[in-house]
């Protein structure tokens, strides 16, 4: 049973508004370069930024990815410096990169919880109950007796110089078959799902992008309370 942790305070170091940039479809490596550019500027006093976009189909691997979790057919994978394991990005999936200067003392787990809570809130607004699974990061649809727990949103971040990079991916109306070639997030005993698959109607990125932007900002600044549940596993580099 979850309790509610009061969070009337922002996790951000800056009180200035977050700049939200909706970029459409962007190549993964180009977006990664942009993240690093913005993060460097943020570390030097620039604004907090939330990038919202989609990627052309691509597999990316976090630092804990094992060889056997990669595509068996040798499909190329981009190795990244984020936490977590391997995942897929592609059309129909909303990717968010919050590049945020965290308040001291840094609480990276709390940051991840706030991202999770923002996406849990969006799913609830759409009529889909979701939550967390103990010991696993991300947002999940609960097992229903027929199907196992299913991940609908993945989270993988890195923190450098007190600034966050990478972020979350919410499956809206994407091709779930793309996850079949890998062990998504290194988890073998659970499934992957999307808003469209769960709700029985098409739920595209365009329908949720504004909701996600608002919820992420509300969660980061403490206007959405975070339920107290087991901590997400994250990695930080200073």
Curated annotation (Swiss-Prot):
Report the family membership.
Belongs to the LipB family.
Q: Which gene encodes it?
A: lipB
For this protein, the record's PANTHER family field holds: LIPOYLTRANSFERASE 2, MITOCHONDRIAL-RELATED, OCTANOYLTRANSFERASE
* Metabolic or biological pathway, per its Swiss-Prot or TrEMBL entry: Protein modification; protein lipoylation via endogenous pathway; protein N(6)-(lipoyl)lysine from octanoyl-[acyl-carrier-protein]: step 1/2
> EC number(s) on record?
2.3.1.181
Q: Can you list the GO cellular component terms from the UniProt entry?
A: cytoplasm
Reported function: Catalyzes the transfer of endogenously produced octanoic acid from octanoyl-acyl-carrier-protein onto the lipoyl domains of lipoate-dependent enzymes. Lipoyl-ACP can also act as a substrate although octanoyl-ACP is likely to be the physiological substrate.
Q: What is this protein called?
A: Octanoyltransferase
Gene Ontology BP annotations: protein modification process
Report if keyword Zinc is assigned. no
